[in-house]
UniProtKB/Swiss-Prot annotation, chains A, B:
Carbohydrate attachment residues: 130
Source organism of the structure: Glycine max (Soybean)
Family, per entry: Belongs to the APS1/VSP family.
Gene3D superfamilies assigned: HAD superfamily/HAD-like
Record gene name: VSPB
Name under which the protein is recorded: Stem 31 kDa glycoprotein
Record NCBIfam families: Veg_Stor_Prot
UniProt keyword terms in alphabetical order: Glycoprotein, Seed storage protein, Signal, Storage protein
Tissues in which the protein is found: Accumulates in the stems of developing soybean seedlings.
Pro-peptide region(s): 21-35
Length: 254, 254
């Protein structure tokens, strides 16, 4: 019996990371010596591990985490978590002397504009990303503000910081993105940087690094970076910034 | 009324980050527009923000987070969170070809040896750190293993990785640390690096970077770093490692 448990555990442990689809299809349940974990507990650990960048490059969330993710997003914890992160960014900003070329960089999707209306129709990340469907949704220009980020955005503006939006959205979405930002309450910005489809970069991390390098060359001081993806926050050319990771338990962009 | 609320909020927002003691003395309650957050919700956000490195350099946890932290540590979530992080480290390790000079670096306190027995007598981080009392406790040599890390340690050893313990404990604790590690089930290691009190470094981050530089010079390949503090995981000379952040909602070491 002990050997069998060991064998099962070994197969589980070896098989898990080999799945291209990451967590989705593989049962997370493992004999642990302290009993089975409930989905709620396991998925809270999944979520924490995503936020602390311990779980990376997952293509879908585990199937058993659909309901816990839904509960998290729609309950008060997600908003509280967003609030705490935005507060920290504001506290940090409010302690600084503001120079005229100081910028805060914000991502767009799931940082200032919520894409939860899209994801709630697509299993909160359990389905693999479908660019066509997602683009259709983006092109509606109907994404609401993430309210805690909107508050922080307004506070940073009133402190005198300039705002740069830096997104992986392609340039053909410029008009709809501008309109959506304004509709959601983000009325002003120093720059809105979308991705030139001719620009070849290996991933979002290097694209965002390259765009930040441009900003530094233009004479801006990057004071803070706020995003829902680690690829917004890691990489080069971060200037003297502190970075702030907003919660996103639904997907990962490399 | 609206103005009054705004004024209170402004005072709260400005006053909060000015406290030397960080979160402790200041009421976290704020009018948010979506109702008051309970301590449970706020402290879960505090914890998440600490793990994702959004909250830094706190000297004590907020007073209202003592009970939620106690519940978290003593409930199954803390252990589940530790398990998930250790699993990720193992999955990552198991996909690599092992070279004879490949090492995993582990911290000691709250990474392999639990200091929860100490912290549960000191408010789970609500009291400012008392080096004398903590040293007395360390010198007992009675710290238990963190069970999920112990499992992972044994698995990494059986994959063929070498283990280096790198700790901010001072060199005078070498004997008690060796004995405590063995007593807790950590029977072997490639190196156990404690801090030379004559070595002056500005903080733990630079101390750990310097020690890693030594390891790289000695020809080791740093494959993974596992610690409960961001100062274990950030900084220079990380080789080709992936890093793994174990949960610690109780204190922060710069």
């Amino acid at each position: 019996m002990k050997l069998f448990v060991f064998f099962v555990a070994a197969v589980v442990l070896v098989a898990w990371p080999c799945h291209g689809a990451g967590y989705q299809r593989f049962p997370l349940r493992m004999k642990t010596g302290y009993g089975e974990r409930s989905s709620e507990v396991k998925c809270a650990s999944f979520r924490l591990a995503v936020e602390a960048h311990n779980i990376r490059a997952f293509k879908t969330i585990p199937e058993e985490c659909v309901e816990p993710t839904k509960d998290y997003i729609n309950g008060e914890q997600f908003r509280s978590d967003s609030k705490t992160v935005n507060q920290q960014a504001f506290f940090y900003a409010s302690e600084r002397e503001v120079h005229h070329n100081d910028i805060f960089i914000f991502g767009i999707d799931n940082t200032v504009l919520s894409n939860i209306p899209y994801y709630e129709k697509h299993g909160y990340g359990v389905e693999e990303f479908n660019e066509t469907l997602y683009d259709e949704w983006v092109n509606k220009g109907d994404a609401p503000a993430l309210p805690e980020t909107l508050k922080n955005y307004n506070k940073l503006l009133s402190l005198g910081f300039k705002i740069v939006f830096l997104s992986g959205r392609y340039l053909d979405k410029m008009a709809v993105t501008e309109a959506n930002l304004k509709k959601a309450g983000f009325h002003t910005w120093e720059q809105l940087i979308l991705k030139d489809p001719h620009l070849i970069t290996p991933n979002a991390l290097s694209y965002k690094s390259a765009m930040r390098e441009n900003l530094l060359r233009q004479g801006y001081r990057i004071v803070g970076i706020i995003g829902d993806q680690w690829s917004d926050l890691l990489g080069d050319h971060r200037g003297e910034s502190r970075t702030f990771k907003l919660p996103n338990p639904m997907y990962y962009i490399e």
